[in-house]
């Protein structure tokens, strides 16, 4: 047990997960596209697709665990997913799923960052070091996923 706690502390304090500043996207233009919502087994999912129809962001409610997964396509693993909103930003530990090609982070449904995403003025951004950030409009589908996980 002590080894597991020590490993977790070392990981959280490692340079790979250092709390470097998340870039400011206040003046960034949101990608043209639209959010859609779909009920899925065990929750709901909001997907942002660009104007070419390519999925760019996913917010998924896992109702059984009351968690929200934030994911974006990625060519490779990265230790951190950067989340930016008009009033908050945070680096989140990320996990890569090679089967789906998605890099994701998980938040509890009550995490205040989700409220910041839902209420962000105009846009949100999800970034990964070495890849362009995805700047998407902050539409109601974000709130729908968050609220569904809180019920």
Describe the role of every protein-language-model region.
Residues 50-52, 83-85, 128-130:
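Short acidic, glycine-rich loop/turn motifs
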Residues 1-4:
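Positively charged n-region of N-terminal signal peptides that target proteins for export
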Residues 22, 87-151:
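Internal interaction segment
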């Amino acid at each position: 047990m002590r080894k597991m706690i020590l490993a977790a502390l070392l990981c959280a304090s490692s340079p790979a997960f250092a709390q470097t500043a998340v870039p400011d996207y206040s003046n960034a233009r949101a990608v043209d596209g639209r959010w859609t919502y779909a009920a899925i087994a065990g929750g709901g999912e909001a997907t942002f697709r660009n104007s070419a129809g390519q999925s760019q962001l996913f917010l998924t409610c896992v109702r059984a665990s009351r968690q929200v997964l934030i994911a974006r396509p990625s060519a490779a693993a990265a230790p951190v997913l950067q989340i930016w909103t008009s009033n908050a930003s945070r680096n989140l530990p990320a996990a890569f799923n090679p089967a789906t090609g998605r890099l994701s982070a998980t938040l509890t449904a009550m995490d205040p960052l989700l409220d910041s995403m839902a209420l962000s003025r105009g846009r949100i951004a999800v970034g990964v070091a070495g890849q362009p950030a995805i700047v998407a409009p902050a539409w109601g589908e974000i709130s729908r996923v968050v609220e569904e996980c809180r019920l």
